Regions:
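Active-site glycine-rich loop that binds ribose-phosphate moieties when present
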Residues: 81-87, 119-130
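A generic local structural motif
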Residues: 9-12, 31-32, 87-89, 125-128
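Ligand-binding beta-strand-loop-alpha-helix segment within the catalytic cores
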Residues: 59-109
Length: 135
């Protein structure tokens, strides 16, 4: 079996995102997708912690510790960005208002079964229902 690196998966996924799409970025590998997007494609990024119009990772003097993505990494905001609570963020995803949601995978089996969250106790994770595949 040919194994892809996480970076190769992120690069491949970035190539599949259409110009102008609204895309939710989850935690982990999805964050790497952002670094592989073409700037001229005008892709609008949403972070599940409540940012629509998220920009690239912040560096140096651009770091604002109050502006972070869902993975708690400092990011920038694009002109016109908006901020809201995570319940609105998940409503945008579940309501079909975004073109794509890229979830981090906790575990994926050889047959494609997905575990994308662990609470450490019984319960329903916040991302339940977001992993449905529509073809």
């Amino acid at each position: 079996m040919n194994k892809w690196t996480t970076q190769e998966m992120a690069q491949r996924l970035a190539r599949d995102i259409e110009p102008g799409w609204y895309v939710n970025i989850g935690i982990g590998m999805p964050e790497m997708v952002c670094e592989n997007l073409r700037e001229d494609d005008d892709i609008i990024l949403q972070s599940e912690n409540g940012i629509l119009g998220m920009g690239p990772l912040a560096r140096g003097d651009d770091i604002d510790t109050d502006l972070v993505n869902a993975g708690k990494k400092p990011v920038t905001a694009r002109l016109g960005a908006s901020y809201f609570e995570h319940t609105t963020s998940f409503a945008m995803m579940r309501g079909g208002h975004l073109d794509l949601c890229i979830l981090g995978a906790f575990q994926v089996s050889g047959s494609g079964d997905l575990a994308n969250w662990s609470l450490g106790r019984p319960g329903i994770p916040p991302a339940v229902g977001l992993s449905l595949i529509h073809i």
